[in-house]
């Protein structure tokens, strides 16, 4: 499914070159996870998607136990998700990061390490109760995602002619 935000993801990857993480914020069920996973499949050699709604405690605990030992953090993530990570060619996605704010605050150290790119997704991530007691990383670039507009809806229906007629 084609979305306008996809081009912004490509631009972020080109411009950031690993110097910032991307936080995609938007309402529930607008396709954040879908578009990020499509972007990962098309633009990286490998990716890991950590869905914090479903991630077991052992994955969440890694961010407390190994933040000062990133080699082991990446080793555990790679083995748990059975995905080989390639330096500067892999993306790690923190899906629904508001559920586990500790992972969001870890972005500062992960980006500084420079091995991989990071995208965080979430709804309501800027609500005070979801950012309480964490340091919001300055290494985050924000992108707002909205529901499909009419043109995107027509793309999804494979109806490109109607938009031309309207314009």
List the model feature ranges, each with a label:
Residues 1-167:
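Phosphate-binding site recognition
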């Amino acid at each position: 499914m084609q979305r306008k935000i996809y081009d912004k993801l490509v631009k972020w990857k080109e411009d950031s070159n690993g110097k910032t993480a991307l936080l995609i914020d938007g309402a529930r069920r607008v396709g954040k996870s879908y578009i990020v996973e499509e972007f990962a499949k098309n633009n990286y050699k490998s990716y890991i998607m950590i869905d914090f709604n479903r991630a077991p405690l052992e994955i969440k605990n890694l961010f407390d136990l190994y933040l000062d030992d990133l080699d082991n953090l990446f080793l555990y993530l790679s083995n748990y998700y059975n995905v080989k990570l390639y330096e500067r060619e892999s993306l790690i996605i923190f899906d629904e990061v508001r559920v586990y704010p500790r992972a969001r605050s870890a972005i500062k150290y992960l980006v500084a390490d420079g091995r991989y790119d990071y995208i965080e997704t979430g709804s309501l991530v800027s609500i005070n109760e979801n950012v309480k007691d964490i340091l919001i990383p300055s290494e985050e670039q924000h992108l707002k995602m909205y529901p499909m507009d009419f043109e995107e809806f027509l793309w999804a229906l494979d109806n490109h002619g109607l938009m031309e007629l309207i314009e």
